[in-house]
A protein has these predicted regions:
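Glycine-rich phosphate/nucleotide-binding loop
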Residues: 217-246, 326-330, 334-439
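Composition-driven recognition of long, low-complexity, acid-poor segments enriched in small hydrophobic
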Residues: 36-74, 78
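Short, glycine-rich nucleotide/cofactor-binding loops
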Residues: 101-114, 251-261, 402-408
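Phosphate/nucleotide-donor binding subsite
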Residues: 153-197
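Low-acidity, Ser/Thr- and Arg-rich intrinsically disordered low-complexity segments
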Residues: 8-9, 15-26, 30-33, 38, ...
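N-terminal phosphate-binding or glycine-rich loops at protein starts, especially the Walker A/P-loop
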Residues: 76-142
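Glycine-rich phosphate/diphosphate-binding loop of Rossmann-like nucleotide-binding domains
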Residues: 114-115, 132, 253-315, 319
Length: 439
């Protein structure tokens, strides 16, 4: 039997239906409906079993057929949606034939290799991936022992879901980007070489972003016609299923109008292929909507984007419109984009802190928090930068995902999901067409 709704508690006393908050009333109705559906299906199944035992072979065949229909119809139409609404999940098995190889810089990051390894082990359980984990073997095994994931690591190696690839001394977070030339066998260089040799379809690193970009340019090379690669990050919008791609968010501090034009072309292809937007709306980040607003970079870039026939240019995008859902791609210089990125990373925690502070204290506050808990978790998930744990380096001849230096396991899983999505949607094929047009 489903538990009674909040309105049936004797401690609350009689209350009219109209005085109950609308959100609570909807939750009660939703819960009762789900409980009613479950009760009806359970009763029907029980009755069918009794009828089958009494009716003999013929009835048993009918019941068996009914059970098959119930499992094929009621399961996807009733129980699976209820399980998703109630926050549950039931992972389906992953066919090993569908797994794609991704090279992971295991030594990149503030706390590597521990959190990176932990995230990779979680990712191969959730995503159709195989991981080439590059790093210093002694440090990898020590991290696995410290996190008590040694058995899980060995199982992944035995199943050929993860392969440890040895590398030399790693590049530190404080090293200059030019260190990639001196430390030729560093983990990030080995990872890039695996992609270049087609032994992996994508590379992920949470290491020194300057070194990652330098290694990608030196090892993979730039696409023909692209002067500067750009880092593109996905930001949440009002529509949960429609993120906006913002680039550049940190690769190029000083830009020319031609660079922003190229960023728009790169972002247009990614939005179309991976985000499945048929005609992406391109916006230019500016201080006003009018064509005459902005500095020289903005004014000259506006002209290039407006005259580009391959783009659906939607005009200037003010800061308040980035998350509005009115644009699919927003282009800017790397300095401005990085400031915007770091600001938005703080929004989730600040917003949740304000909501918690405004909830009333005492019994009413606890009751309200209980009903809002799932909503707050969904809000946090949409705004938490760990859920968008990686950014694509667009403009190099390979799929490269850059993660936060402070990435934990959840961020690693999110970044690897992004890498898999880009690799499985044929982004590089369309980028090759772009370089033939620009060349």
């Amino acid at each position: 039997m489903p538990p009674k709704g909040p309105d049936s508690s004797p401690a609350d006393g009689p209350r009219s239906k109209n005085s109950r908050p609308r959100a609570i009333r909807r939750l009660v109705i939703w819960y009762r409906r789900n409980a009613a559906v479950t009760t009806i299906v359970d009763s029907a199944t029980s009755s069918a079993n009794v009828a089958g035992s009494m009716a003999g072979t013929v009835a048993e065949s009918v019941v068996s057929g009914a059970g098959t229909v119930a499992s094929s119809v009621l399961q996807p139409l009733v129980f699976d949606p209820l399980r998703r609404l109630q926050g549950g999940s039931e992972d389906e098995g992953i066919d090993d034939r569908d797994r794609l190889w991704v090279a992971v810089d295991g030594m990149g990051g503030d706390h590597a290799p521990g959190p990176i390894l932990e995230g990779c082990l979680q990712a191969i359980e959730r995503l159709p991936l195989r991981i080439k984990f590059i790093g210093e073997r002694d440090r990898i095994m020590a991290a696995a022992d410290a996190l008590q994931i040694g058995d899980q690591l060995q199982a992944a190696v035995d199943n050929r879901h993860l392969e440890i690839v040895a590398s030399g001394p790693s590049i530190g977070m404080d090293d200059e980007a030019t260190a990639v030339r001196r430390k030729r066998d560093a983990s990030i260089n080995v990872a890039m070489d695996l992609v270049k040799k087609k032994e992996a379809l994508a590379v992920y690193s949470a290491g020194n972003s300057g070194a990652v970009m330098a290694s990608a340019i030196f090892r993979l090379g730039r696409l023909k016609g692209i002067d500067r690669p750009a880092i593109g990050a996905l930001f949440p919008t009002k529509d949960p299923g429609q993120p906006v791609l913002v680039l550049d968010v940190g690769a190029n501090m000083d830009c020319k109008p031609a660079y922003l034009h190229q960023f728009a072309l790169l972002g247009n292809i990614y939005s179309r292929d991976v985000l499945q937007v048929s005609r992406p709306r391109i916006g230019l980040l500016n201080i006003g909507e009018e064509e005459c607003k902005g500095n020289e970079l903005s004014l000259r870039s506006f002209e290039l984007l407006r005259d580009e026939k391959r783009l659906r240019f939607a005009g200037n995008c003010e800061g308040r419109d980035v998350l509005s859902g009115e644009f699919d791609v927003v282009v800017c210089d790397g300095f401005t984009g990085n400031v915007l990125l770091k600001f938005l990373e703080s929004v989730g925690s600040v917003l949740l802190g304000v909501l918690r502070a405004e909830l009333p204290r005492g019994r009413r506050g606890k009751v309200g928090s209980a009903f809002l808990r799932s909503n707050l978790k969904r809000i946090k998930k949409r705004l938490d930068h760990a859920e968008h744990g990686g950014a694509l380096l667009l403009g190099v001849n390979g799929i490269c995902v850059i993660g936060h230096g402070s990435s934990k396991a959840l961020s690693v899983v999110s970044a690897l999901r992004l890498a898999h999505s880009a690799a499985s949607h044929g982004v590089m094929d369309d980028l090759a067409e772009l370089q033939s047009c620009c060349g």
